[in-house]
């Protein structure tokens, strides 16, 4: 658990993991804050893909949600990962009513010019009270309606490692949404 990029020697560890017989695909999930200076080295070490957890594109919200609070560092990490060939870069976005559900179109817009795969994830309610209650969950159908003009991507034509997600694309977009 935890953020892998804070581990000293993460590039060397990645190289060792990539060299294990039978491992054909190596990916990493990260908050992206430390990714920019490490992306090229990780790619050279054998990392193939990254998943970046990013729940807002608003700097003020980002600062309130995270301890490090530097949205610009995460966005630089996203660009560095793409430039290093760690792709498709996937953004995991947990959509929460009243927190970031108004940003669904902005996240979808990121896919127009970038080879990103934005994955909108439903909030998993935990308990009857508190922040993670069911009333904050945004159903898939509601997320989908916030992104008009999406076309389904044929099965098998979506991003590698996409799992069971339904994948869509805006007409003419480089990236995809799932």
Which positions does each model-derived feature cover?
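Auxiliary Fe-S-binding modules of radical SAM enzymes
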Residues: 109, 113, 120-126, 130-178
């Amino acid at each position: 658990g935890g953020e892998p990029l804070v581990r000293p020697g993460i590039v060397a560890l990645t190289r060792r993991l990539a060299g294990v017989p039978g491992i054909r695909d190596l990916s990493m999930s990260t908050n992206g804050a430390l990714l920019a200076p490490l992306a090229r080295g990780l790619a050279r070490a054998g990392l193939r893909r990254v998943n970046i957890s990013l729940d807002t594109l608003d700097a003020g919200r980002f600062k309130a949600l995270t301890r490090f609070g530097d949205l610009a560092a995460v966005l630089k990490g996203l660009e560095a990962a793409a430039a290093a060939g760690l792709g498709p870069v996937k953004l995991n976005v947990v959509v929460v009513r009243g927190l970031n559900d108004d940003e669904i179109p902005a996240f979808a817009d990121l896919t127009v010019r970038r080879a990103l795969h934005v994955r909108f994830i439903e909030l998993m309610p935990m308990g009857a009270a508190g922040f993670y209650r069911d009333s904050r969950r945004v159903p898939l159908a509601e997320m989908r309606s916030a992104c008009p003009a999406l076309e389904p991507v044929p099965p098998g034509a979506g991003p590698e490692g996409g799992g069971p997600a339904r994948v869509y694309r805006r007409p003419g977009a480089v990236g995809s949404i799932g």
